[in-house]
């Protein structure tokens, strides 16, 4: 068996990636989220495939086909709710995975980090298009509002929006193309994940100390396979509790009303995992400025390696930057809350303050904190 595992051209790739991979001996549970994201992606692709067998991407029948899946298809309700809540679990793992990368300075592995940012954008695009497919009120109006933002692009904006819509409003053509893209993107994401792993295995994993761990490596299997399996069990437990007991808790009641272009819902808002970016978008009175801030709220992650001023890689031994980091986490939670609130006083002011704080902490305060720590420790 060992001979096959190490010699077979296909199996040896798996062997070098998941079995004989040298891994740092001290990586904590924060390193579990990569495998959990892989699991989420597999769940989403499988449930999505079975949903696509029964779904129809036509404005006249889309809403009814989802109702048909839930009522008439064997375990259709389970597949549908697993897919809907699977997206939420996916984003929880994504945010924790990115948060881990920021905390432990993993952004210094630039190729892996940039690939991760591309993956984040791809997953967000996929989730947005997926939300449009049930063709409820929030699906329709969410698609209208978000695609309309592209009209802020000078000169080509209006043409671009009509090209994406396939007409003069969100309609049948839009739904059909969104379904096509929503179906194909997860497979593209899978390919990008392999590239992400390829880049990671070029450098090896980071660890909580941020120090070189070449002198103290252990094989991935059995140590981290068993550790990942525990993470998988906990994730599946939480996932099934959410899906079976509270399937609609993260959804919007408006999406149980069929899409009606003549009736605007009182509060148009995206799914919870986009609320922080939506709050930043709404905080800027100018349309183009809002769109740029929205894109920058994610793209700013690409600047992280350039903004790293500390002589130490991780925040493990850096209490000042740690404080900044946790203020940033709190700020993101505030933005998420504000994104779900109506556009009125005091929420507008809170949102604007939190948006300024978000960019200021990353661009100004964390780099300054790093320099102060260098000074305190005489690392200059």
From Swiss-Prot:
Residue positions annotated to bind a ubiquinone are 201
Q: Which UniProt keywords apply?
A: Electron transport, Heme, Iron, Membrane, Metal-binding, Mitochondrion, Mitochondrion inner membrane, Respiratory chain, Transmembrane, Transmembrane helix, Transport, Ubiquinone
Name the GO terms of the biological process aspect.
Answer: mitochondrial electron transport, ubiquinol to cytochrome c
In its UniProt record, a GO molecular function of this protein is:
ubiquinol-cytochrome-c reductase activity
Q: Say if the entry is tagged with keyword Heme.
A: yes
Q: Where is the signal peptide?
A: none
Record text on cofactor binding: Binds 2 heme b groups non-covalently.
Its UniProt miscellaneous note says: Heme 1 (or BL or b562) is low-potential and absorbs at about 562 nm, and heme 2 (or BH or b566) is high-potential and absorbs at about 566 nm.
Question: Briefly, what is this protein's role?
Answer: Component of the ubiquinol-cytochrome c reductase complex (complex III or cytochrome b-c1 complex) that is part of the mitochondrial respiratory chain. The b-c1 complex mediates electron transfer from ubiquinol to cytochrome c. Contributes to the generation of a proton gradient across the mitochondrial membrane that is then used for ATP synthesis.
The protein's name: Cytochrome b
């Amino acid at each position: 068996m060992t001979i096959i595992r190490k010699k077979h051209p296909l199996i040896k790739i798996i062997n070098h990636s998941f079995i004989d991979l040298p891994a740092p001996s001290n990586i904590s549970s924060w390193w579990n989220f990569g495998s959990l994201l892989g699991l989420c992606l597999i769940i989403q692709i499988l449930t999505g495939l079975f949903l696509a067998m029964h779904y129809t991407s036509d404005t006249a029948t889309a809403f009814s086909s989802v109702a048909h899946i839930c009522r008439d298809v064997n375990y259709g309700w389970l597949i549908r709710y697993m897919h809907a809540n699977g997206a939420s679990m996916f984003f929880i793992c994504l945010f924790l995975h990115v948060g881990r990368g920021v905390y432990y300075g993993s952004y210094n592995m630039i190729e892996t980090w940039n690939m991760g940012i591309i993956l984040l954008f791809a997953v967000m695009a996929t989730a947005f298009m997926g939300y449009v497919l049930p063709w409820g009120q929030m699906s329709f109006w969410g698609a209208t509002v978000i695609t309309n933002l592209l009209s802020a692009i000078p000169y080509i904006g209006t043409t671009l929006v009509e090209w994406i819509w396939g007409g003069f409003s969100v309609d049948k053509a839009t739904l059909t193309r969104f379904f096509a893209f929503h179906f194909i993107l997860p497979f593209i994401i899978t390919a990008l994940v392999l590239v992400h792993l390829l880049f990671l295995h070029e450098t090896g994993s980071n660890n909580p100390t941020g120090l070189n761990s070449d002198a103290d490596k252990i094989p991935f299997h059995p140590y981290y396979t068993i550790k990942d399996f525990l993470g998988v069990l906990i994730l599946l437990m939480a996932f099934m509790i959410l899906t079976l007991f509270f399937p609609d808790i993260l959804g919007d009641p408006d999406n149980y009303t069929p899409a009606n272009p003549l009736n605007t819902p009182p509060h148009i808002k995206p799914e919870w995992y986009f609320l922080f970016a939506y709050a930043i978008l709404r905080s800027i009175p100018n349309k183009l400025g809002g769109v740029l801030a929205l894109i920058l709220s994610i793209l700013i992650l690409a600047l992280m390696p350039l903004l790293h001023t500390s002589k130490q890689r991780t925040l493990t031994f850096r209490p000042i930057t740690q404080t900044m980091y946790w203020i940033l986490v709190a700020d993101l939670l505030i933005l998420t809350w504000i994104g779900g609130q109506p556009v009125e006083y005091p929420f507008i002011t809170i949102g604007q303050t939190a948006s300024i704080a978000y960019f200021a902490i990353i661009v100004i305060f964390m780099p300054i904190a790093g320099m102060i720590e260098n000074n305190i420790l005489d690392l200059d």
